């Protein structure tokens, strides 16, 4: 019998790789005991990049969500881990050092055991400080190698980085094959090289199924010494996401490895619950093409999770490109032709930008440059004329050291713009900032929260946190959700009137008790306005006034708990007795 292989359920990344949002705290509270019941997971990825921020985006408190999810897993002896972008923390751009230090203290107190620290450029300067900060905060630092396939990403390149990270105190190494393009034999050689030199180091493999290599890669890394494999569950496994635990377990068991058994009754429960979450609201923001695999990903190297955003970008510019072509007297381009053109442009751009591993945020930078180049070429203009500031920061070395050399044309372009290259430690560009955020919280009368977790959220995601606190985030999300639901119904061939009838059929009308003018609020500071679709009202809440013809103001109360799905009478509109003012769906 070969060595024991453990499984980690990447529940957070399953959602990130499939769509825009993450489950709510109440949903995580329901799935966690079922994950425990499955009995096959030593670890679960609970939070990190694209989790806390996403909670804020739909108006929920991420700290509550993290604590809710980790507690039952901890009680069952399952280790929890989070995704950590090193210098970028939990966001897409650099974070001051004092905020990075606070992150580990907060997340440890919230029940997160392990932090998977990665830098999209594999620059150890962005990872090593986090190893130290994580240990000081009580967490286990899992240092990460971002896997890609290029002439400069050799076994020697990666083992040299691993040596430095292990020397800095990392007890674990993750091979983050975020696009699934790591070649199986190569990955096996890399694991073997690390294990031969550092047999005590735990190696965890994280791969995506997009190009179709993942199962072979898993077998290779296990045969060469890997300890833990990241897996998913239905209905979100496969496609461009992750391999399913059932298939991985069966393959490794047949190969002679010791693997845990799966409680299939619990698996089916987890599958059903996850589908319920998709049907509830998450599915409205999931791109169906993420369920498709594509060998084309091997050529461009883009992560599977990016395909949805890339297709959205392409659909957005497709009609514009065809208008340009029409003006030039040329035939219109099919969307599939445009996809191939973009893939080919990524292959052209990537080496000339120094082969940055195509992982967040650098995958977005490369994709955006390629997309802009395609647009410029269609117009008959030069490449490289539409490079944004974030991409220039990467090119100039402000995010870290690029693995490969920049093309001479890029260097010349930078010089022509008067831009300066740097090899300074990227952190030196971002001074400490917690005192500034403490002052803001004090001025607003906001609590720092348990273990300073609210202070941390403001410091990490300041704009999103302010929108969350003001209620703007919730309001915006509910509008987006209603639009997405309406669009889905419209796809089914329903007219706007039919969609309205369906929404009304599920809702209760708030009726005018008398003839008069609708006044939702009486503002003395600015214009009064109607409430937003999605706004919640409780049973005894005041809803509006009716200004009657005889000069009275009659209060209208809701009478039940629900959310607005339609405003039928706008602020200031005249209504007759019994006329619907609004429709609310009961909760």
Place the predicted regions along the sequence by residue:
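Hydrophobic faces of well-ordered beta-strands that scaffold small-molecule active sites
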Residues: 5-13, 19, 42-46, 78-85, ...
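Glycine-rich phosphate-binding active-site loops on the catalytic face of alpha/beta enzymes
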Residues: 117, 177, 224-243
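Catalytic cores of alpha/beta
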Residues: 156-165, 211-227
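C-terminal helical cap(s) of enzyme catalytic domains, especially alpha/beta-barrels
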Residues: 237-262
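Short histidine-centered loop motifs in beta-beta connectors
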Residues: 519-536, 560, 564-573
């Amino acid at each position: 019998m070969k060595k024991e292989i453990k499984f980690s359920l990447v529940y957070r990344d399953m959602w990130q790789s499939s769509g825009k949002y993450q489950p709510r705290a109440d949903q995580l509270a329901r799935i966690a005991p079922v994950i425990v019941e499955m009995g096959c997971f030593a670890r679960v990825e609970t939070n990190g990049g694209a989790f806390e921020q996403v909670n804020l985006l739909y108006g929920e408190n991420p700290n509550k969500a993290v604590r809710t999810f980790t507690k039952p897993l901890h009680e069952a002896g399952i280790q929890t881990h989070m995704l950590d972008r090193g210098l970028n923390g939990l966001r897409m751009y650099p974070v001051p050092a004092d905020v990075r230090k606070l992150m580990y203290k907060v997340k440890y107190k919230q029940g997160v055991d392990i932090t998977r620290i990665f830098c999209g450029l594999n620059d150890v300067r962005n990872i090593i400080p986090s190893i130290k900060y994580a240990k000081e905060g009580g967490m286990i630092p899992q240092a990460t190698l971002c896997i890609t396939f290029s002439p400069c990403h050799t076994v020697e390149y990666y083992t040299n980085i691993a040596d430095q990270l292990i020397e800095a105190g990392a007890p674990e190494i993750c091979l983050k094959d975020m696009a699934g393009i790591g070649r199986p034999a190569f990955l096996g050689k890399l694991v073997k090289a690390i294990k031969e030199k550092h047999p005590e180091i735990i190696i965890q493999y994280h791969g995506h199924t997009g190009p179709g290599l993942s199962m072979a890669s898993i077998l290779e890394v296990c045969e060469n010494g890997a300890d833990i494999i990241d897996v998913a569950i239905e209905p979100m496994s496969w496609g461009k996401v992750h391999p399913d635990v059932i298939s991985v377990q069966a393959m490794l068991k047949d190969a002679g490895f010791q693997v845990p058994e799966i409680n299939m009754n619990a698996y089916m429960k987890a599958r059903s619950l996850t589908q319920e979450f998709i049907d509830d609201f998450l599915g409205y923001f999931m791109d169906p093409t993420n369920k498709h695999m594509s060998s084309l990903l091997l050529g461009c190297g883009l992560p599977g999770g990016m395909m949805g955003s890339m297709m959205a970008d392409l659909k957005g510019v497709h009609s514009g490109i065809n208008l340009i072509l029409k003006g030039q007297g040329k035939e219109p381009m099919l969307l599939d032709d445009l996809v191939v053109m973009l893939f080919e442009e990524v292959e052209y751009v990537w080496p000339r930008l120094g082969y940055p591993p195509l992982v967040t945020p650098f995958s977005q930078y490369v994709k955006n440059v390629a997309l802009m180049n395609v647009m410029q070429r269609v117009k008959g203009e030069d490449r490289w004329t539409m490079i944004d500031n974030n991409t220039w920061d990467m090119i100039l070395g402000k995010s870290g050291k690029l693995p490969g050399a920049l093309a001479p044309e890029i260097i010349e372009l930078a010089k022509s713009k008067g831009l300066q290259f740097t090899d300074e430690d990227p952190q030196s560009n971002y001074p400490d900032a917690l005192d500034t955020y403490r002052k803001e919280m004090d001025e607003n009368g906001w609590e720092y929260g348990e273990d300073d977790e609210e202070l941390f959220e403001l410091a990490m995601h300041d704009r999103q946190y302010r929108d969350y606190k003001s209620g703007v985030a919730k309001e915006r999300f509910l509008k987006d959700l209603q639009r997405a639901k309406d669009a889905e119904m419209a796809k089914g061939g329903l007219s706007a009137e039919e969609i309205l009838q369906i929404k009304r059929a599920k809702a209760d009308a708030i009726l005018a008790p008398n003839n008069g003018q609708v006044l939702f609020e009486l503002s003395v500071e600015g214009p009064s306005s109607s409430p937003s679709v999605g706004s919640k009202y409780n049973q005894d809440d005041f809803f509006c006034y009716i200004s009657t013809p005889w000069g009275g103001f009659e209060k209208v109360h809701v009478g039940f708990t629900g959310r607005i799905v339609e405003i039928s009478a706008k602020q200031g509109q005249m209504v007759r007795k019994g006329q619907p003012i609004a429709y609310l769906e009961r909760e």
